[in-house]
Amino acid sequence: MASVVSLAGTLGLLLVSALPEVLGDRRSPDRRAHPGDAGQVGPAAAEPRRQSPPSKNQRERARSGALPLGALYTAAAVAFVLYKCLQQGKDEAAVLQEEADKKDSLQSEQHLAQLTQQLVQTEQHLNSLMAQLDPLFERVTTLAGAQQELLHMKLQTIHQLLQDSKPNKGVEVPEPEASIPFLEDFCIEEDEEEAGDNQAWEEPLNWNTGTRNLTPPREMQPTLRRRCRKSAAQGLSHSPHWKEGKTVDGLVKQSLFL
């Protein structure tokens, strides 16, 4: 705004200074033609000149000589002022553009600083979360490893027990259970033997009757059966195959219930 006012003032001063030259001094052509004849012209001669007004042609000639110079001067002054105004306007536009660029760059730097600060805060939050989750990850990993080891040990134990329960190739395989007599068979055989012995001692043998009656009396049968069961149970308890089967079954059940 101040630059515009100064330019307007400069233009006004130039126009005011150009006005006298445009108008000029309208002196008579006699004075212009004979400026040094002051002595020849006396007061008497000056009176008629003063009294006679200048002609119209003389005025037009004076104006036509003065106008082109003043117009050229004024046009040059106006052109110079306009040039200065345009140049100053360009300079002001460049200055404004530089200020706008500086302001934009400053805003960009501030925005970048804010983003950097937010990124640092986010990184700190992530680090704190990872620090809280690390113990949980370690516990889960430890528990998973322990469970895996325990399961592996159980599988190895079961496999070993199954291998131990199988008969070896170099050892003779015992006869099936059908070859082992039942408790009642032992009891019946012993009853028959004892009854036969008692009858042999008490009664004479009758070889003519064909077969002997080895059945013991009814009063002695319960006692004989109890004794047979006890002796059979003791014999089976001393059997190595029975002990091995029992221990293997017990170990398998125990490992499965762990």
UniProtKB/Swiss-Prot annotation:
Residues 25-63, 203-222 are annotated as: Disordered. Residues 106-134 form a coiled coil. It comes from the Eukaryota. Keywords: Coiled coil, Membrane, Signal, Transmembrane, Transmembrane helix. One of its GO terms (cellular component) is membrane. The chain crosses the membrane at residues 66-86. Residues 1-24 form the signal peptide. It is found in: Membrane. It is a single-pass membrane protein. Residues 25-35 have a biased composition (Basic and acidic residues). This is Coiled-coil domain-containing protein 107. The lineage of its organism: Eukaryota, Metazoa, Chordata, Craniata, Vertebrata.
